[in-house]
Design a protein with these regions (language model features):
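Beta-strand->loop->alpha-helix junctions that form or flank phosphate-binding loops
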Residues: 117-124, 144-145, 251-254, 298
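Active-site glycine-centered loops adjacent to acidic/histidine catalytic or metal-binding residues
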Residues: 97, 121, 144, 203, ...
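Conserved AMP-binding/adenylation subdomain of ANL enzymes
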Residues: 1-20, 24-62, 77
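Gly/Ser/Thr-rich phosphate-binding loop
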Residues: 36-39, 61-66, 75-139, 151, ...
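AMP-binding/adenylate-forming catalytic core of the ANL superfamily
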Residues: 54, 64, 152, 158-161, ...
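Alpha-helix/helix-capping structural signal
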Residues: 69-72, 98-99, 176-177, 218
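Adenylate-forming
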Residues: 1-5, 17, 30, 53-55, ...
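Adenylate-forming AMP-binding core of the ANL superfamily, especially NRPS adenylation
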Residues: 99, 131, 138-184, 192
């Protein structure tokens, strides 16, 4: 049955899978299950952008599971390096783990073709939303529609359903009634639910008239400055396109008058003329409403992204909040 399912999803054709991420994560681990269907797996000891292209060509790789950080590193390869390798065997790249910037995914589709499948969810519950490249090109930035047994709902602070294109808390209703279960943590499991089988993974989102979900931020990452809700993802999506920025994260830090304010933490690119923090903030303000932009900016060496491309913003915030009651 598993093999039949794999063949059905792949149009009756299967081939080698490239595993580029750690197998303790549900994405790469789920890929190795295709061994049951007779699909061979090529496992990389650690991710390297050019070696990934080399493996695709050498082994005729059919599919892989990646995260947006892998995409960014692949796109950073010089054009002459990209041109060296034949990637025409690739038929499917699923991506998960973190939100993918629109420009990054668009560039990957232009390079690899419409082979991408965004699978949004969590290890504790599986995939809750999915979107093909074709649907994504019509709805750029979306993580797709809810997949059975889940129904997506956007709720306000009183847990009322919100109309289309209105931002709120993203919940899923599980038709099986199971919901999300955190291992050995019944309190956390209970806190994620507002009713049996109705749970959240902690995201802020909106849903259009067709049911496509667009994630904008996380509850825990939201910054409240002077009573105004600020979403770090917005300035992050602007600053990541500055030519001197390699990576960026925005967090809330203490402010005596406003309660907290936005701070950008930027990893600069090497061999670039580095502008001052003030110049970079001004650059952001030219492209985004002033109140949504960071008030301060620090250059850092590391943001602590894990192997699946996620940042623990609680750890990033901690030094700034130490001693603040």
């Amino acid at each position: 049955n598993f093999k039949a399912g794999v063949l059905e999803r792949s149009g009756g054709v299967i081939g080698p899978q490239l595993v580029v991420g750690p197998m303790y994560h549900t994405g790469p681990l789920s890929g190795t299950r295709q061994l049951i269907a007779g699909v061979s797996s090529v496992i990389m000891a650690r991710f390297n952008a050019e070696k990934t292209l080399e493996a695709i060509q050498e082994h005729g790789i059919f599919s892989s599971i990646m995260v947006p950080t892998h995409f960014v590193r692949l796109l950073a390869l010089p054009d002459d390096v990209r041109a060296k390798y034949d990637i025409s065997s690739i038929r499917s790249i699923s991506h998960t783990g973190a939100k993918c910037p629109v420009d990054v995914k668009r560039e990957m589709i232009e390079w690899f073709g419409p082979v991408f499948l965004d699978a949004y969810g969590a290890s504790k519950v599986g995939t809750t939303c999915m979107i093909t490249s074709e649907d994504w090109l019509r709805n750029p930035g979306s993580v797709g529609k809810a997949v059975p047994p889940f129904t997506a709902r956007i709720l306000d602070d009183d847990n009322n359903d919100l109309p289309a294109n209105t931002e709120g808390k993203l919940y899923f209703e599980d038709a099986t009634g199971r919901g999300v279960i955190y291992h050995n943590d019944p309190e956390k499991s209970a806190a994620a639910h507002i009713a049996p089988g109705v749970f959240t993974l902690g995201e802020i989102a909106y849903m259009n008239e067709e049911g496509f979900v667009f994630i904008t931020d996380r509850f825990s990452d939201m910054v409240v400055s002077g009573g105004v809700n600020l979403y770090p993802a917005e300035p992050e999506q602007v600053l990541i396109h500055h030519p001197a920025v390699l990576d960026v994260a925005c967090i809330g830090v203490p402010h005596k008058e406003m309660g907290e304010e936005l701070k950008a933490l930027v990893i600069p690119k090497e061999d670039m003329d580095l502008p001052s923090p003030e110049v970079m903030i001004a650059w952001c303000r030219e492209r985004l409403s002033h109140y949504k932009c960071p008030r301060t900016l620090d250059f850092v060496d590391d943001l602590g992204r894990n192997t699946m491309g996620k940042i623990n913003k609680r750890k990033l915030r901690a030094p700034y909040w130490e001693g603040v009651s």
